[in-house]
Amino acid sequence: LYQEFLKLKAMENRYNLIFNNGIKFGGLLGAIFIFLSLIYYIADFNMFNVMFGLVNFILVIAIYIVFFGWANTELRVKNLNGWLTYPEGLLHTFIIGMIAAIIQVAYNYLFYTLFDPEYLTKMGEKVMEMLENNPNLPAQALEEAERKIAEMTPAKSALQGLYYSMAMSFIFALIVSAFTKKKRDIFDETGLQTPEEQQ
């Protein structure tokens, strides 16, 4: 019975470590994406350029994969005695992505309302200009796009970013966790490092 208690306690400790590390790494990932957004803003890149869109998409994918892989490996090696199950890795990376997404939403909302209140309007105008230059776009579709752009607010834009970021996080969490999992050592009784091992 005592052994079962120790195992339950060890499992609780594991999930506490997963949660705490997820928050820490999530804050770091959120800061990385904010830094990237500021670079784009300061450099005044054309967000609607096809090449920019492709490069940015590849860069975001690379950041997610490398960061999630690094975070799970750090957690497994330094905190969880060298083993990590797939559900644990998935939970850890999803927490990271969720925290990063929340930080991004808060930043985007403050950016749209305080730092550059005209930013959304400018982006909307560029979108409409691009659509109007498309001769194959039906008038009805153009009107629908214009209506949606007119209804866009900082809160709506930030929430859309939240949904997108969380979806991306979950997809890459599913993939990366499959490669960062590692079976438990058969001689490991608790799954956690002893104080001597942690020193």
Which residue ranges define each predicted feature?
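Low-complexity, intrinsically disordered extramembrane tails and loops of integral membrane proteins
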Residues: L1-N16, R184-Q199
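Transmembrane alpha-helical insertion/packing segments
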Residues: F5-L75
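Alpha-helical transmembrane segments of multi-pass membrane proteins
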Residues: N20-L28, E88-A100
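Alpha-helical transmembrane segments of multipass membrane proteins
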Residues: I32-Y40, V60-F67, A100-Q104, N108, ...
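Membrane-helix interface/capping segments
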Residues: W70-E88
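Functional transmembrane-helix hotspots
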Residues: A106-P135
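Short membrane-interface loop/juxtamembrane segments of multi-pass integral membrane proteins
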Residues: M130-T153
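Transmembrane alpha-helical segments in integral membrane proteins
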Residues: P154-D185
